[in-house]
Amino acid sequence: MTRKQRRLTIIGGALFVLAVAAGLVLNALRDSIVFFSTPTMVAEKHVAPGKRFRLGGLVQPGSLKRGDDLAVTFEVADGGAKLPVAYKGILPDLFREGQGVVAEGALDASGVFKADTVLAKHDETYMPKEVADTLKKQGHWKDDYGKPQGAAKPGAVSMREGEKTAAGATQ
């Protein structure tokens, strides 16, 4: 083998090893890149019990139950699937039903997500992008989702000194 052939073989081998290493790293990070998984994603992936991940969605109205010693259970939903969550600790001040939440923990053998951290978004109109996409796909999306409370409806005009609304009323 000539020097040129040997050099090309070494360069080709190095590139192959680099490509394999990059593929292994990307494969290992594939699940870690997502900030959180929605209940639908968890159901589709069949996440193994004990595997840590972040769960995001909306706290299902009527599902919040408080127990002894700061124990709380609630359901996180994304419009498609619901996942029961158990947490023991102090909840954020802004945590409430219908609110966006991200919980970190793992599934137990019975399918309950055991959270050790719960975060609530400060904006009551917060909705994770994945949840909004799921709601749109399933036809449950309402146009006023994601707008601050009290926001003007399309076609309305502000009510400053004598201005008219779209309906024609004056102040």
Swiss-Prot record:
Coiled coil: none
Gene3D superfamilies: Nucleic acid-binding proteins
Molecular function GO labels: heme binding; metal ion binding
Periplasmic side: 29-171
Biological processes annotated in GO: cytochrome complex assembly
Cellular component terms per the entry's GO annotation: plasma membrane
Subcellular location per the Swiss-Prot or TrEMBL entry: Cell inner membrane
Lineage top rank: taxon: Bacteria
Residues holding heme: 122, 126
Membrane topology field: Single-pass type II membrane protein
Ranges of biased composition (kind: Basic and acidic residues): 137-146
Family label: Belongs to the CcmE/CycJ family.
NCBIfam families membership: PRK13254.1-1, PRK13254.1-3, PRK13254.1-5
Functional description taken from the UniProt entry: Heme chaperone required for the biogenesis of c-type cytochromes. Transiently binds heme delivered by CcmC and transfers the heme to apo-cytochromes in a process facilitated by CcmF and CcmH.
Name this protein carries in UniProt: Cytochrome c-type biogenesis protein CcmE
High-level lineage: Bacteria, Pseudomonadati, Pseudomonadota, Alphaproteobacteria, Hyphomicrobiales
Gene label: ccmE
